[in-house]
């Protein structure tokens, strides 16, 4: 007989939160996130656990190969707790673009000719721009 109480995912607990820290001391692609609704917002970020960032299949995340996340402090993310309602072991699934402070969260360059202009912009201002017009 199966014991579903021990099955990871039997009590799926997801959240939306804000990234508060990206300086993972173990360099393991983790971030500290305030999962809104699970903790009082007055909790110091030092008391939050490090959350693992899930990477795409194009990043092997194995033995020094792959890539690192590009989340920034202030990014809004969606995640879930591997340990269910205990809410101590989080996995970050992705980020959510928003306009929380009145600024659109996609690069200005991408707004110029949507949907054919594909843009990747780093925090330092480096830009990779692709005109994806057919033909």
PLM features: residue spans?
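Hydrophobic packing positions characteristic
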Residues: 1-135
């Amino acid at each position: 007989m199966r014991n579903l109480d021990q099955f990871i995912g039997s009590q799926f607990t997801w959240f939306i939160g804000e990234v508060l820290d990206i300086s993972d001391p173990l360099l393991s692609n983790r971030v500290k996130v305030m999962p809104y609704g699970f903790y009082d917002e007055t909790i110091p970020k030092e008391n939050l656990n490090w959350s693992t960032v899930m990477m795409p299949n194009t990043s092997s995340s194995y033995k020094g190969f792959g890539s690192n996340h590009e989340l920034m402090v202030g990014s809004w993310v969606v995640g879930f707790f591997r340990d269910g309602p205990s809410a101590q072991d989080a996995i970050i699934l992705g980020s959510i673009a928003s306009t929380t402070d009145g600024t659109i969260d996609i690069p200005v360059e991408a707004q110029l000719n949507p949907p054919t202009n594909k843009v990747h912009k780093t925090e330092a201002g480096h830009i990779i721009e692709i005109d994806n017009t057919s033909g």
